[in-house]
């Protein structure tokens, strides 16, 4: 395996960081009552990939009840938790970006930390379309203190593709959203010897031309990839297969390190192809059984396998 080249500011053993991101597919139960959100909230909180992280980034926390259940279940392991993007405005240290316009749901992103959160901010993207345009899409920024060492984490969920034939518009919106992330980092004036991590469902297919543009635009090194070769897999994931049986599997979820700040000696993204205990839902007299935590697989990142 060829490791990515990381420049100066190598992290020492006592400043290692392990982050996991997971798009949990908590759609609002009022609109989508048959996706086992409450069952999956309990299953996810007990899943092996949840254990032993420093930071968790969650996407698609659109349903209030299952989100509250998940966060409550994880409170003992991850006591420091941001609100969901777009909610509880008085609990954020700062709010940036586009705050006007009618939105029908929150932004779905929350960060949970084993270590104290020193600062938490939310930013709303200026552009979005389709269902994303009706949500308070943006990113969550936290500064955490791990045993005296500061780390900066941005969790986000970029514009999704609309329809089966991309027209380029969604990629253009993702590009503007990445530019907002870069501008935010620039304006924060974060010390160069402190690590900055960007993670979440970025909706960019690994290996595509957009992927290589993303690495450049976000100013991040390409990580080493281990684990499953897709994070949204219609051939192995029962939920993804049910929803989109004709679409090809895709690698969409990442945890990346900003080049301009402290670097680990190596950085792995590990996609976990994990099955959950069986859970069932009923609709119109028919019972459906699934064995997946979500339609996306979680991704963990660290500087050690």
Language model segments and positions:
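Bacterial N-terminal signal peptides
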Residues: 1-4
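N-terminal, active-site-proximal structural segment of metallo-dependent hydrolase catalytic domains
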Residues: 6-76, 86-95, 106, 179-182, ...
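Structural recognition of the beta-strand scaffold that forms the well-ordered cores
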Residues: 18-21, 54-59, 82-83, 109-111, ...
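Acidic/histidine-rich helix-loop elements
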Residues: 21-41, 96-101, 129-133, 159-173
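Active-site environment of divalent metal-dependent phosphoester hydrolases
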Residues: 26-28, 63-66, 161-162, 203-209
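Structured beta-strand-rich core segments of catalytic domains in phosphoester-bond hydrolases
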Residues: 61-159
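His/acidic metal-ligating clusters that form di-metal
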Residues: 138-156, 170-212
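Metal-dependent phosphoester-hydrolase catalytic domains
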Residues: 187-197, 203-305
């Amino acid at each position: 395996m060829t490791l990515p080249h990381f420049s100066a500011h190598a992290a020492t053993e006592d400043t290692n960081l392990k982050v996991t991101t997971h798009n949990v597919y908590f759609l609002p139960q009022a609109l989508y009552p048959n996706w086992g959100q409450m069952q999956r909230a309990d299953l996810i909180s007990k899943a092996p990939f949840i254990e032993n992280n420093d930071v968790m980034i969650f996407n698609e926390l659109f349903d209030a009840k299952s989100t509250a259940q998940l966060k409550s279940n994880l409170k003992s392991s991850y006591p420091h938790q941001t609100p969901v993007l777009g909610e509880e405005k008085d609990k954020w240290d700062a709010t940036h970006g586009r705050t006007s316009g009618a939105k029908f749901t929150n932004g779905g992103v929350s960060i949970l930390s084993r270590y104290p959160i020193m600062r938490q901010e939310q930013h709303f993207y200026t552009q979005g379309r389709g269902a994303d345009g009706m949500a308070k899409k943006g990113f969550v920024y936290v500064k955490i203190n791990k045993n005296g060492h500061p780390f900066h984490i941005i969790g986000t969920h970029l514009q999704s593709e609309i329809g089966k034939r991309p027209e380029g518009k969604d990629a253009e919106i993702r590009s503007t959203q990445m530019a907002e992330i870069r501008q935010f980092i620039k304006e924060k004036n974060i010390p160069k010897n402190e690590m900055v991590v960007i993670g979440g469902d970025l909706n960019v297919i690994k290996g595509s031309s957009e992927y290589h543009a993303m690495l450049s635009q976000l100013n991040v090194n390409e990580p080493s990839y281990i684990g499953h070769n897709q994070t949204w897999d219609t051939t192995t994931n029962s939920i993804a297969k049910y929803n989109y049986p004709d679409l090809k599997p895709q690698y969409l979820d990442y945890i990346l390190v900003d080049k301009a700040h402290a670097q680990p000696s190596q950085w792995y993204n590990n996609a976990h192809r994990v099955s959950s205990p069986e859970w069932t839902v009923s609709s119109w007299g028919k019972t459906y059984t699934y064995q997946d935590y979500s339609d996306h697989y979680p991704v963990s990142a660290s500087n050690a396998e």
